[in-house]
Amino acid sequence: MAKRVVSPNPMLSLETENIAKMGTLTADSLGSMWNVFTKCAENLENGRRLENISWRLWYREAMMSDANDACQIACQESSVPDLSSSCDSINSTVESDAGHVVDSNSFNRIDNVSVNAPIVNEVSLQAPMKGGSHSSIVRPQAKRSSSRLLSTDAFSQFISSFSPPEKPSMKDLALFHGNKSPSSKETIPKVSNSNSSDTSTDDQAYLNVSVSENEHADRSIKTHSSAPPLNQQKSSTSVNDAVSKAIQLVKSTSDLGSLSTNTSSTAQKNKSRKPTKSFSDAVAAASRAKELEKEKLSKVTVTPDDSTSIIRGFDPRLPVLSTKNVSHEEKSHSVQDDKSKQLLKPNPTQPYFYLRGSFDTGHSASSSICSAAVDSESVNSADFPHRTVYDPLPTHAIAESISQENVIEDDDDDDDAWVSVDEAESPHFTKRSPAPYLSKSFRNSALSLLLSQDEKLQHDVRSASSAALNLPRDTDIKATPNLSQSGNINSDNSDLSNYPYNDYRVYRMSHCSSNSNKVLASEISESLRRDLLWERRQKAAMNSAVLRRQSSQSSGANDDKEVRNRKVVEKGFANDCSVW
């Protein structure tokens, strides 16, 4: 019996257009489809699915018949639907061609396509009909043969491409030894022995023995065969014995060659003692590779100074950290680089400078105070020319800012002091409070900041805040520079400890920005747009109120509805007036 060839990749691929073109309702096409899909299911793309479809079509054609034809069938008839076109005998030429579908190399023979085609015998029904009524008609129960005829013409109609089968043992060995270099592998041909004579020819053809450098040290030879377990044990033992004998012969010949290298007669004797060329060359190459590897390992010396280690599975492509002696100057440079990197990296344990403090109860002291600013001694202005480093506030300024937060809690102008800073001259800070301007978008603007500053100047808010902060007597409030007029104040010349931190520092930074005019112009236009929108809403509300009033007067409603509408309009007007 021919053995079924199982390959890891599908060898046959079908085209759906060709299957659709052929007559799928004829018995001949159904028989050929069923034959190919069932016999070649493991070597086809989507073979299992096609096999299932072909079985369903075959059962439908063989066991079902039309309802009109079923009424005309006589009760005594016992026959299956007409399948004569596929059951007829085929000429000997066609049978010879069906055995070899594709003629390629010697190992590219498909045994699963060759089908022995016996003629289907006629089958009779087991239960004869008793009456002439159509209700007692029994469907024919036919025993079909497992194999049917297949011609090369029907086969070539829906086979689009064919790839030769691969030896499974070769692919598995390649996957198993994929991490090793191909130069270290040597394939040894098959060694015949009387003990392995009962193995099949197909199994011996697929037998492969791979000998690598690392496996020679342990005298372990791995064999891969597609034979059953019993035959595999016999063949492996015979091959192991043959290879061990060959290695002993090669050793003996190498010893004799080393003793008598100067004389030509001894060299000829050693050549005559050697076994066949192909086998001895393979084993000799493996032994040479083993000796080279031993020499490489002997050259490697492990000392306490050079901390090198031989690790199994070491990948030389990965970079290795060198542990050489480093001079004192290089160490100092590396320490300075590490310090500069540490200064730039954010430290989560220390609070950082915020452009505007987050006015929470838990983080009010840490966020509004520049307590974690870098010391002026450690960071020079020459090292970071593009950054503006602010000196830390003294302790009394910190206490004053904390007391100012506790005293001035009802003033909403402190919360509105959020201004965008120029990107070119950004202050030295690492993170901001989580977007405080999103909660009150119409109050946190440069325009509202200017208006609030004017209100402070008019109502003399500074005198109240200075009295609450207990400033020194010699410092006069009028001597403090007017920040609304002097916008180009240098941060290095001004002493930050003389000003309340939350009030003046942020405002001074806002006027140092170069795009303040653009920001103000855009905010004024936005405020005008909001004014127009508010007027439209008021007009719409008034029109709706007038319409409601007219409808209520026409219907004879009371005056309470007019008062109610007037209250609604006044309430909406009061809500929409809070634009600033």
From Swiss-Prot:
Ranges of Low complexity composition bias in the record: 192-203
Compositionally skewed regions (Polar residues) per UniProt: 223-241, 256-269, 481-495
Coiled-coil regions listed in the entry: none
Biased composition (Basic and acidic residues): 326-341
GO biological process: cellular response to heat; mitochondria-nucleus signaling pathway; negative regulation of transcription by RNA polymerase II; regulation of nitrogen utilization
Disulfide bridge map: none
Recorded superkingdom: Eukaryota
Gene Ontology cellular component terms for the protein in this record: cytoplasm; cytosol
Chain positions covered by the region annotation Disordered: 161-241, 256-281, 325-345, 472-495, 544-564
Protein name from the UniProt record: Uncharacterized protein C1420.01c
Organism: Schizosaccharomyces pombe (strain 972 / ATCC 24843) (Fission yeast)
